[in-house]
Amino acid sequence: MGITHELDIFVTNEDLALKNIELFKGNSYGCFINLKVKEEKRFNMIFVLRPDWSEIDSVKPIRMTVNNNHVDVEKVSESIHEVVYSASFLISFNSLVKVFSDDPDKYKNVYPTVTINVPKKKFKVVDQGNTYMFIQYPIDDCDKERFLKDEFKYCDNEYDQYNDCDE
């Protein structure tokens, strides 16, 4: 059958989700993100990896570069269902972000490529690679509540009893 992990990336300060960035099959995950900016900007990203444990004992860590410079990716939490990572970086010109578990140059034909034009608020999947990836804007409320509680304050306590995001 083959391994099929699930990976979502949340670009929190743009309220944008890159969903289903996993390969159709295989023990590798990653993507290329072209960021277009007009001025200095900080980006905060949350990575949610849902491993397929059927044929592996541990997950490969997520690594990241911006314009070929290493960016620290911190593991925030880990459970049997998912591993959550975060990263933050600052850019002042158009940049290429590589998110990967394995050598990105080896997988450049299968990892997806996305362009995020921040000033114009335009987002595009340039190449899906071997994935079913899509862009979600804005990030849906269930994902915000599960993974981004500290990033977004969007819910009044009065309405918490009606929250349908709980599993």
Swiss-Prot record:
- What biological-process GO terms show up in the record? viral process
Which residue ranges does UniProt annotate as crossing the membrane?
none
> Which InterPro entries does this entry report, sorted A to Z?
Poxvirus_C7/F8A
Question: Which Pfam families has this protein been placed in?
Answer: Pox_C7_F8A (PF03287)
Please, which domain of life does this record's source organism belong to? Viruses
Q: Which family does it belong to?
A: Belongs to the poxviridae C7 protein family.
What is the recorded function of this protein according to its Swiss-Prot or TrEMBL entry? Plays a role for multiplication of the virus in different cell types.
Stated name of the protein = Probable host range protein 2
Which species does the entry assign this protein to?
Yaba monkey tumor virus (strain VR587)
The taxonomy runs: Viruses, Varidnaviria, Bamfordvirae, Nucleocytoviricota, Pokkesviricetes
